[in-house]
Amino acid sequence: MLSRVSIRSLPLCTRTFATTSILKQSELTAATDSSGKEIVSGAPRELVTERVVRIYQEAKPATQSGHHNGSHWKLDWDVLGKGNRWENDLMGYQGSADYMQGTIMKFDTKESAIKFAENQGWDHYVQEPKKRHFRKKDYSANFYHSAGPLKHIRTK
């Protein structure tokens, strides 16, 4: 909790804020994990530190010829087990206790995504994008001679 403390009665610009001594030293050390990193999100420790994340680059959409979102690397979380999913009886919707399930983070480079995951203390694995193979097709290939029997194509 912050309280306003006036040091001297000088002009208004010299007033400062000071924190009260509500937080004890034991509470400050309880907020850090074993590696010395501070957990500030307020989430349970097992959900914050023991997560596995996937780092990948999104594939090109099959219905378009452009490379939309192909330059970004994404980070998302694996699905938790332990009964953290359920189905709504009335509508049949899927529910989850995992608050990070629908969260996807974008990064400019793979290295920055890996560094972020390591700084958060998450285990990670990287899915490298599959290389696209471009095969040149000619219209004349439809009329090449084949040694086998002729194809009979039925239209009706």
Curated annotation (Swiss-Prot):
Keywords: Electron transport, Membrane, Mitochondrion, Mitochondrion inner membrane, Respiratory chain, Transit peptide, Transport, Virulence. One of its GO terms (biological process) is electron transport chain. This is NADH dehydrogenase [ubiquinone] iron-sulfur protein 4, mitochondrial. It comes from Candida albicans (strain SC5314 / ATCC MYA-2876). Signal peptide: none annotated. Residues 1-17 form a transit peptide. Accessory subunit of the mitochondrial membrane respiratory chain NADH dehydrogenase (Complex I), that is believed not to be involved in catalysis. Complex I functions in the transfer of electrons from NADH to the respiratory chain. The immediate electron acceptor for the enzyme is believed to be ubiquinone. Involved in osmotic stress resistance and thermotolerance. Component of the mitochondrial membrane respiratory chain NADH dehydrogenase (Complex I). It is a peripheral membrane protein. It comes from the Eukaryota. It is found in: Mitochondrion inner membrane. Belongs to the complex I NDUFS4 subunit family. GO terms for cellular component: mitochondrial inner membrane; plasma membrane; respiratory chain complex I. InterPro entries: NADH_UbQ_FeS_4_mit-like (IPR006885), NDUFS4-like_sf (IPR038532). Disruption phenotype: Leads to thermosensitivity, as well as to osmotic stress agents sorbitol and KCl.
